[in-house]
């Protein structure tokens, strides 16, 4: 619902138009493209989508299939929720210990993603198999970040998702040679700085019903971001210095705003103040220093 979405994104500045686009996309549970210029929060949005689903889930620690053992619970991607064992309101001491309660998972794979991570892989020493990423992210969100920059060709990666996106189940090959069908019950998000139509053909785009552009923040949103980031960086907000920054390094340069820049520029100003051994304070001189370095090749 809209209220769930607002709560999930309460720590981000998201305008109404973006919320209204994200809501139906999340409810569909099918898949979405998040695209736009780098630094505008695509990954931050994707990371918070799972919060809108709410609550927690139970998953088996491992799966046993005809002699093959597949480890599903992964402390690297799953956050275990520890319950009271009998002293609290609910007595969970009798819960089958083969199951574990976790926060709904958000699994993020970036440019380092390889095809082997999407298949069952067996450890040759222990003979125990590792579940693929899409199995670990069931009942949550799988984010393919920096889509189009993986080492494998884009069409190879896309072909891997055609059946799961269409049928809501996936096929996995086990080391024994057996093929099994598993649920594909999750939202998959492709996040990219590139134009989707330049990456994939129309047939695949049809299977991703929601394509949402994450645009540049407005000037008002940019100012709001600075005001939020200032105390987090140890600064008091200085309207005159902020106006100087915007007038000199944005309006005069015809430079677009990016959501990441308040944080990045304030970090530069902070380092400048530490180096000069002066109080941490916004100033035109400090913003000139930060902008000259930050925008030198941009």
Each model region followed by its residue ranges:
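Short, mixed-charge aromatic SLiMs
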Residues: 48-54, 251-252, 287-298
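Helical "lid/switch" subdomain of P-loop NTPase nucleotide-binding domains
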Residues: 153-157, 196, 200, 204
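Conserved ASCE/P-loop NTPase catalytic core
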Residues: 6-190
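Dynamic helix-loop-helix/coil hinge segments at AAA+ ATPase domain boundaries and subdomain interfaces
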Residues: 1-19, 235, 252-256
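Conserved C-terminal helix/linker of AAA+ ATPases
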Residues: 259-266, 272-298
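Amphipathic alpha-helical interaction segments
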Residues: 20, 24, 44, 160, ...
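Conserved C-terminal "switch" segment of AAA+ ATPases
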Residues: 197-201, 214-262, 275-280
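Amphipathic alpha-helical segments in well-structured domains
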Residues: 158-161, 205, 283
């Amino acid at each position: 619902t809209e209220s769930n979405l607002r709560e999930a994104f309460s720590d981000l500045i998201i305008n109404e138009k973006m919320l209204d686009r994200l809501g139906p996309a999340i409810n569909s549970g099918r898949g979405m493209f998040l695209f736009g210029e780098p630094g505008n929060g695509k990954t931050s949005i994707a990371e918070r989508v799972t919060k809108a689903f709410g609550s927690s889930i139970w998953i088996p620690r491992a799966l046993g299939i005809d002699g093959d053992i597949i480890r599903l619970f992964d402390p690297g991607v799953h956050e275990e929720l520890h319950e009271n064992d009998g002293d609290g309101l609910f007595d969970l001491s009798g819960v089958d210990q083969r199951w574990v309660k976790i926060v709904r998972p958000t699994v993020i794979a970036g440019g380092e993603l390889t095809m082997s991570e999407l298949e069952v892989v067996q450890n040759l020493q222990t003979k125990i198999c590792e579940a693929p990423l899409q199995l670990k992210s069931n009942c949550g969100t799988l984010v393919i970040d920096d889509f189009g920059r993986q080492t494998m060709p884009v069409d190879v990666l896309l072909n891997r998702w055609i059946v799961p996106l269409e049928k809501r189940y996936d096929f996995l090959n086990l080391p024994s040679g057996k093929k099994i069908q598993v649920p594909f019950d999750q939202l998959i998000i492709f996040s990219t700085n590139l134009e989707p139509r330049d990456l994939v053909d129309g047939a695949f785009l049809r299977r991703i019903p929601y394509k949402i552009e994450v645009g540049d923040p407005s000037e008002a949103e940019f100012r709001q971001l600075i005001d939020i980031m200032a105390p987090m960086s140890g600064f008091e907000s200085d309207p005159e210095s902020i106006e100087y920054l915007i007038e000199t390094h944005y309006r005069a340069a015809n430079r677009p705003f990016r959501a990441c820049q308040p944080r990045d520029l304030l970090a530069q100003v902070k380092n400048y103040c530490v180096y000069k051994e002066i109080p941490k304070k916004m100033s035109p001189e400090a913003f000139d220093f930060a902008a000259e370095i930050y925008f030198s090749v941009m």
